Amino acid sequence: MERREEQLGAAGAGAAPALDFTVENVEKALHQLYYDPNIDNKNLAQKWLMQAQVSPQAWHFSWQLLQPDKVPEIQYFGASALHIKISRYWSDIPTDQYESLKAQLFTQITRFASGSKIVLTRLCVALASLALSMMPDAWPCAVADMVRLFQAEDSPVDSQGRCLALLELLTVLPEEFQTSRLPQYRKGLVRTSLAVECGTVFPLLEQLLQQPSSPSCVRQKVLKCFSSWVQLEVPLQDCEALIQAAFAALQDSELFDSSVEAIVNAISQPDAQRYVNTLLKLIPLVLGLQEQLRQAVQNGDMETSHGICRIAVALGENHSRALLDQVEHWQSFLALVNMIMFCTGIPGHYPVNETTSSLTLTFWYTLQDDILSFEAEKQAVYQQVYRPVYFQLVDVLLHKAQFPSDEEYGFWSSDEKEQFRIYRVDISDTLMYVYEMLGAELLSNLYDKLGRLLTSSEEPYSWQHTEALLYGFQSIAETIDVNYSDVVPGLIGLIPRISISNVQLADTVMFTIGALSEWLADHPVMINSVLPLVLHALGNPELSVSSVSTLKKICRECKYDLPPYAANIVAVSQDVLMKQIHKTSQCMWLMQALGFLLSALQVEEILKNLHSLISPYIQQLEKLAEEIPNPSNKLAIVHILGLLSNLFTTLDVSHHEDDHEGPELRKLPVPQGPNPVVVVLQQVFQLIQKVLSKWLNDAQVVEAVCAIFEKSVKTLLDDFAPMVPQLCEMLGRMYSTVPQASALDLTRQLVHIFAHEPAHFPPIEALFLLVTSVTLSLFQQGPRDHPDIVDSFMQLLAQALKRKPDLFLCERLDVKAVFQCAVLALKFPEAPTVKASCGFFTELLPRCGEIESVGKVVQEDGRMLLIAVLEAIGGQASRSLMDCFADILFALNKHCFSLLSMWIKEALQPPGFPSARLSPEQKDTFSQQILRERVNKRRVKEMVKEFTLLCRGLHGTDYTADY
């Protein structure tokens, strides 16, 4: 091996000095890794060992570490080092060393066949990697050779040991192929070669599996080996005998799990649907498992029922279309569907008593999609067969969605309750999907059941049953337009009759009412049937989320019909807010609900309600403004400001939100005079300034203040105009004292909405110049500590160029400094900041011709920008940002072509720039490609992606598969 070590001197260059990587030092480091209690020492040892594994010396010490006198941990490291050297540094191995390396690995595997299993596996993986690298040319019959060598009678190892070692090697070979870093063209060749080798492997596996004398450990290994090989997309018909043998092995409890895995992997191969005859032969085999399934369910054997269900679902889900097409076999497929239905409705509560039913849900989606994809005539036939099945499915799902008894539920862990919640969401999604198949009849079916349940005097009904039926309604109504359903009026009439004695039932009642809010908007006469229930529930903290979200939906959808109820809604809401019944987020939702509600009232009514609603908070804020800042009063201030901003988010008397709803919407006339929100903001403006003066250094408070105005601006649009001058002045003072990103975001909103209006341009221009000047000063002090400010600043600049380029005409704006700061921002590690900076340049470069100062700066400093872009593409920036940098290159090419053609050649001339991996020819090709493409932005993005892969040494590797 010394010879190989000399020849492979290049491998692992850059690791620690060669003398360090001796057998003795590796053993010491391993001892430190496994037994040293100090975590820092462990980490150091691990880092050193990783360097050792890739060093040239690994070829020497790895074989010595495999000596029989070493402990398994040390032997395992030696085997792993061999695998790493073979798989990652194959090109460093001289071709004349292949055979001796192969022979030594065979020798070691034979020796470890009766030794440590974990070491044996690593050695098998190393030999598998070697085989994949040599196939097909240097080792054309690799698998046949492996089988022949391990069947040799002259081996010192007993036949069972040899057999298990061979099976381990054959098992890891396809697994290593799946994870190997072979180039794409080699992968295709090796896959073809392995497919041919199936002819050697499968007969051997069949023989071992069917041989009565084969011990259980061998048969289990055979099943695992088969499971590994079928993932190479072996034709299903070639697997037929082994699949049948695996079905037979399901009766053996020791082989059950391995058999399930093998069968599921074989059935699930994408190519399997081509072999319909084989699939049809599998249906009776699956149906033959029904008695075993029933016995497992009866005995509470969750593992067995889970495994059999996986097999049935794998066949049904992967091949429903192919099997539906076999019309003459419709009864056997229907039997399979009914078997899966049994699995869906398996007795017990998920996830405590069973975990099987959740496996089946996607099958029902797939089957429905396949039925509905047939042409009309064929679809009608299948609808006739499968509509009753889907009605049965609805009953089964609603039964599975039922809560357990209160006593039983009380014993569930929080994790089990969360899993059950997610399971119910999955059932809800399935019901919503099934509606497409069953239509309005499904709602009628649910309504009839609920009606019978609530009106029957014969026997008391369980709340769980009622809740599940309502949950079914809610699932459908949340996403499907039920406005034309003739059962909803009856449902609304039934809801008040429900005896609510349980939180889960009350929650579902609330969510169901919320899901029907659009229907209530079309049938306002029914609002009074359910609104009292919602207002009553507001006072119950356990119903916080459901009651508040339902009230918000009703206020949003039905606001034009709520004025008669407004006083009551406001009074109840005020009461629960004052009593602090709800958590912060629900308080914010409640304020949004009240904003929707007030929007539909007359201005005088709005002002009156606003006064009574927010006066207590204004008084509290006045008191807090006098106090010395501390953490508790900060929370109170942020809470009050949040309530105000959420109220103003939805309080829209001009009904901008409704503009997209269509002409038929009932709108109130737009009121004349000042907007109520503006009136309130002007009244509290001084108070907000007072609060700010004490909290300017606190980003959270500043953010909360800015949020009030930002949300108001977004809602009010032009109605906000009277506030623009004083808000600009306040923002300027705020930002000059303590720069915060939220102030820049609000400035961006003002630029977006008001900068184009001559009356508002002067204060906005003054604010824009001020925040730009302050931010440029920040860059001089060191902007790396403020990526959020830089991000918001870049977005503001881009918005200014997009909305009002005149802002860049002012002589007081230092365009050169802005340009240089933006180039600096391109080098930030934070992706959002880089993205925002790229966005600025893509807005700036098209202005070269129309804004003189911009044209001048680009001419003087554009080369600096190009170099920054090339550095980023060369590897300095994340690959996910390459499209953004491509946009800059495209803009440079489109708007500064003559300059770019000169700069790009100069910039790419220095050797090693932007990457040492590039040849001069590759750089020249890239520059020519870019300069040629001035129309198709998508092509430029593709060029940049290709170039960055070359720069990073990733071109043609597996790393680029998803790129």
Swiss-Prot record:
Keyword check for Metal-binding, yes or no: no
One short Pfam name that applies is TPR_TNPO3_IPO13_2nd
Return the HEAT repeat spans: 24-54, 56-88, 95-135, 142-179, 194-231, 236-268, 276-325, 330-372, 375-438, 440-476, 487-522, 524-558, 562-600, 603-648, 676-716, 720-754, 761-803, 815-845, 860-893, 897-931
Which biological processes are named by the entry's GO terms? protein import into nucleus
Entry's InterPro entries? ARM-like, ARM-type_fold, Exportin-1/Importin-b-like, Importin-beta_N, Importin_beta-like_NTR, Importin_rep_1, Importin_rep_2, Importin_rep_3
Q: Which SMART domains match?
A: IBN_N
- GO cellular component terms given for this protein: cytoplasm; nucleus
Q: Where in the cell is it found?
A: Cytoplasm; Nucleus
Gene Ontology molecular function, alphabetical: small GTPase binding
Q: How does it assemble?
A: Interacts with UBC9, RAN, RBM8A, eIF-1A and PAX6.
Q: Which PANTHER family match?
A: IMPORTIN-13, TRANSPORTIN 3 AND IMPORTIN 13
What does the UniProt function comment say about this protein?
Functions in nuclear protein import as nuclear transport receptor. Serves as receptor for nuclear localization signals (NLS) in cargo substrates. Is thought to mediate docking of the importin/substrate complex to the nuclear pore complex (NPC) through binding to nucleoporin and the complex is subsequently translocated through the pore by an energy requiring, Ran-dependent mechanism. At the nucleoplasmic side of the NPC, Ran binds to the importin, the importin/substrate complex dissociates and importin is re-exported from the nucleus to the cytoplasm where GTP hydrolysis releases Ran.
Name of this protein: Importin-13
Q: Which organism is it from?
A: Mus musculus
